[in-house]
């Protein structure tokens, strides 16, 4: 039989203005109190929940917190309904319908329509799921209306997976995989790229594009089955494996078909 202890924070709620949180303490406010499940090692917070600690701040209407040794030894929390989250220590903030945060693994997952996650200068959006592991730097953005935006790049796709590498105190994209059965987009300061699948390798400064490829730069538009952009040399090429033909348009000239950098 489950053991339930209900703690009503009457003093905490009615005299919040008189309370000052000390370093190392976690401040929790809720309108409907706390239900503690000792055997299962979690407790529930309901209605207008606000949690403030040294590591993070969170707001939501239903929060489930898992603990280990005692109530203060928080391991993971799951929040739902109008969730807002911010952590200055991890340089991350976000909001969504549901949020899961594993404190030990430093992994955060936001799900639901109009989900948002901000990691320093990198912005992530989706109507499905956004997951970031702060320890490994890995991230996954999935489902419709998924986007990744940074100071140097704008990406859309049904699936955007990759990792961020800490360089000189800021995170930069180190590798990337983007897929979309329709068309994905990768837009930089001077180049627009479209395809159904793309890979980015920062170590080799290469972006590879597969299927229904279009690369736009200035007055040039080139399409084909495969494209590769060398970000270090600032050069690109497009080839065709199936038709042995590539389409190109330059300035206001008409489309012309020609065998160019073919691989077939």
Write out the residue ranges for each language-model feature.
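Sec-dependent N-terminal signal peptides
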Residues: 4-12
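N-terminal amphipathic/hydrophobic interface segments
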Residues: 17-264
């Amino acid at each position: 039989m489950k053991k339930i202890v209900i703690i009503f924070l009457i003093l905490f709620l009615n005299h919040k203005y008189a309370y000052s949180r000390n370093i190392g303490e976690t401040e929790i406010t809720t309108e409907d109190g706390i239900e503690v499940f000792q055997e299962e090692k979690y407790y529930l917070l309901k209605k207008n929940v606000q949690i403030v600690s040294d590591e993070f701040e969170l707001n939501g209407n239903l929060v489930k917190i898992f603990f280990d040794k005692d109530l203060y030894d928080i391991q993971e929390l799951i929040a739902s309904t109008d969730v807002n989250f911010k952590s200055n220590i991890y340089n991350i903030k976000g909001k969504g319908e549901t949020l899961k945060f594993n404190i030990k693994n430093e992994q955060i997952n936001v799900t639901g329509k109009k989900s948002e996650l901000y990691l320093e200068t990198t912005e992530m959006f989706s109507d499905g799921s956004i997951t970031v592991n702060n320890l490994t730097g890995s991230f996954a953005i999935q489902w419709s209306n998924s986007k990744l935006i940074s100071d140097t790049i704008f990406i859309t796709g049904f699936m955007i997976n990759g990792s961020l590498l800490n360089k000189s105190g800021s995170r930069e994209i180190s590798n990337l995989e983007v897929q979309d059965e329709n068309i994905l987009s990768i837009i930089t300061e001077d180049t627009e790229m479209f395809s159904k699948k793309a890979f980015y390798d920062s170590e080799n400064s290469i972006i590879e594009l597969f299927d229904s490829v279009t690369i736009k730069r200035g007055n040039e538009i080139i399409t084909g089955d495969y494209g590769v952009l060398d970000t270090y040399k600032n050069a690109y090429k497009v080839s065709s494996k199936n038709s042995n033909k590539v389409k190109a348009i330059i300035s206001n000239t008409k489309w012309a078909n020609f065998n160019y950098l073919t691989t077939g």
